[in-house]
């Protein structure tokens, strides 16, 4: 079965006064129908810029997608003109933004915003589109959807707004859904409900999901495969089970080692083996990357070669890829 989404050698840069910021470099991945691929990493690793590049929402200037392809059902989005891309965006590929309060139009009711998109992509008349909007709000388990459809974003709670964003994203049954940290600003209970909701709708519509997150707990709960990014590049890719059981690159090892475990000892009596391990150092500036592996200055396993020669991203074990000279 051919992947619904195929991303090949995607590179995005920003032209700034301090130089060229290489936000995303040679990123490739694919996602099948009904599959969830998680992209994880620290703030500034390039995961959100990757998501915005898929949607062609990079502000130009200062940003620019300089190379690569993003294919949805075989159509390369990077080769489309803006009117054609506008039809794809929200139609075949949709996005749930991190903060719905800034993504939703504060001057339009929720129902009108959903209906407007349905009219654009599916060609429904106004009344049928409004009916679809109410149906989608009901679908995402918003109580009293008829009344809520007439409300403005500021009249809803954070969890309710995120549900409305999901309803809008899925109203036209897209083939690909990009979810950029969809639960970051929500409390744990609402977070779980939103993730369950995305999973339920994904199974119903067969949508391919690209989940952007820094939360490895969310990855373990929802994704089938995971891509780990660092300083704009992929450093590891594997199934979720394989990555958690057998991380190969020192960076994912460090991320997993820094996660508190339920039931672990606390206080000053913790043994060295039980202590949380931090990753020393700082993420390098993307306009001044080191010549070799970008993680080498922070890596406890780095050899001289790591500082001068960038490792290739290659197959290390069956269906398990990494970019590291030491694995």
Please describe what each predicted stretch is.
Residues 42, 176-182, 186-268:
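P-loop NTP-binding/switch modules centered on Walker-like glycine-rich loops
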Residues 66, 77-94, 112, 120, ...:
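ABC ATPase NBD coupling module
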Residues 73-76, 127-147, 256-257:
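Conserved ABC ATPase "signature" region
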Residues 143-147, 237-327:
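Short catalytic/signature loops enriched in Gly
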Residues 151-156, 160:
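Conserved ABC ATPase signature
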Residues 171-175:
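A short, proline-enriched helix->beta-strand linker immediately N-terminal to the Walker B motif
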